[in-house]
Regions:
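Generic recognition of flexible, low-complexity loop/linker segments
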Residues: 31-32, 54
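Conserved N-terminal/central alpha/beta ligand/cofactor-binding core
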Residues: 1-24, 29, 70-198
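Short helix-loop-beta connector
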Residues: 36-39
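N-terminal Rossmann-like FAD-binding beta1-loop-alpha1 element of flavoenzymes
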Residues: 41-67
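Short, hydrophobic/aliphatic alpha-helical segments
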Residues: 33-34, 63-75
Length: 198
């Protein structure tokens, strides 16, 4: 627990070994019956890459979602500026990549300032994130045989960066946007453009 002045900051990180923290927490949570999901309304503030993906995914799970957007359209989010790629521990080139290696490289790249349990969770689900992006239609670069291409990037020792040439952020945002708009069309998400939140 950190302290700023006299106010404690609690990250709400579960207890236990780092590899089991979030899995144990997920297994302890109560389930919401599919019949009851429409009783809950989820508010998503921001429709950039994270917000649009979250709103679309929650709607696909059966929740009613209200998505608030500061701009006219989610396509104007600053997520579009990302260029390099997205890292995932899929070990396609068989060069010894693993969740632990991605975890270590990420913590080290963040100058050991990140919350390690959260970074481990990110490394654990990184492969699923790439799969979700592909399912949303993100045109990642591919090898001649059709497999997703990846490269080394930054301080990584292995090839784990999935990319869409120099437009990774744009393509990821367009994939999330198309999923979000599909859910808006189906009535699962209510878009609130040009809104500010306090």
């Amino acid at each position: 627990m950190f302290k700023v002045a006299d106010a404690p900051l609690d990250g709400r990180v579960p207890d236990g070994p780092i590899a089991d923290k979030w899995d144990n927490r997920k297994n302890e949570l109560k389930l919401v019956s599919p019949n009851n999901k429409r009783k809950y309304e989820v508010i998503v503030v921001g429709t950039g890459l994270a917000g649009a993906s979250a709103a679309a995914s929650l709607s696909e799970m059966g929740y009613k979602v209200k998505a608030f957007c500061f701009q006219d359209s989610p396509r104007r989010a600053h997520s579009i500026a990302a260029q390099g790629g997205i890292n995932a521990a899929k070990n396609y080139p068989n060069d010894g990549d693993s969740i632990w290696r991605l975890f270590y490289d990420t913590v080290k790249g963040g100058d050991f300032r990140a919350r390690e349990a959260n970074v481990f969770r990110l490394a654990s689900v990184s492969g699923s994130i790439i799969d979700q992006c592909v399912a949303q239609g993100v045109p990642f670069a591919r090898e001649y045989g059709g497999l997703l291409s990846n490269r080394t990037f930054g301080g990584a020792q292995v090839s784990r960066t999935f990319y869409a040439r120099g437009q990774t952020g744009q393509q990821l945002l367009l994939g999330a946007y198309s999923s979000l708009m599909r859910q808006v069309g189906e009535g699962g998400v209510t878009m609130m453009p040009r809104r500010e939140m306090l």
